[in-house]
From Swiss-Prot:
Region of interest (Disordered), ranges: 1-135
Protein name stated in the entry: Homeobox protein Hox-B5
PANTHER family: HOMEOBOX C5, HOMEOTIC PROTEIN DEFORMED
Extent of Polar residues compositional bias: 49-65
Motif segment (Antp-type hexapeptide): 137-142
Any one GO BP annotation for this protein: positive regulation of transcription by RNA polymerase II
InterPro entries from the UniProt entry: Antp_homeobox_Deformed_sf, HD, HD_metazoa, Homeobox_antennapedia, Homeobox_Antennapedia_CS, Homeobox_CS, Homeodomain-like_sf
One cellular-component annotation, GO: nucleoplasm
Amino acid sequence: GGGGGNVSGSYREAGGNMQPGAYGSYNYTGMDLSISRTAAPTYGGDNSFPGQESSRFRANQNCPLSTPDPLPCAKSQKSELSPADPATSSAHFTETEETSASSETDESTPRSGAPPRALQDNCSPGAAGTDGQSPQIFPWMRKLHINHDMAGPDGKRARTAYTRYQTLELEKEFHFNRYLTRRRRIEIAHTLCLSERQIKIWFQNRRMKWKKDNKLKSMSLATGSSAFQP
């Protein structure tokens, strides 16, 4: 009985000792003061922490400016400019060689053809001088001169071979006018590419034929009328 009382008394004393100590350590005013005191330095530490973070953030912002690596867009441009396939680059190189070779051949051909042009230019002033001295010659006049110079086997001038179109036009004109004026003769000569002399001779021959035909008709009519007379 006495031992149990001592144990309970010691337990109470221990409990009594623990309660004031716990109460003193966990005093409300002490807790508030301790929290406020401990919070002040921790809050100051918290105030200093954003400064460190801001300095780190600024350092991180300054890092891309100091990096020597080029921008990704420049890398992409370089990759686009660089040929992806060596076969395509070789094909492009061969095409440039072919085009350069063709341009060289094109340039060489005019150079080779240049001397004949120069010779023609040298010959042209002489021809121009001769043309300037001689009167102007039209194509139809040149053809007429050739026809006049041509001679037959007997030494006579060759007959002019009129085309069907020329003969038809001359027949039309003769049907309306048996005698031509000089102005009309020149117009017909230019139209049919003939000379005035050829037009004049053709009309003379056509009139002679017409007179001969009329004479034969008149003679036939006279003989016919005399035959019907009693």
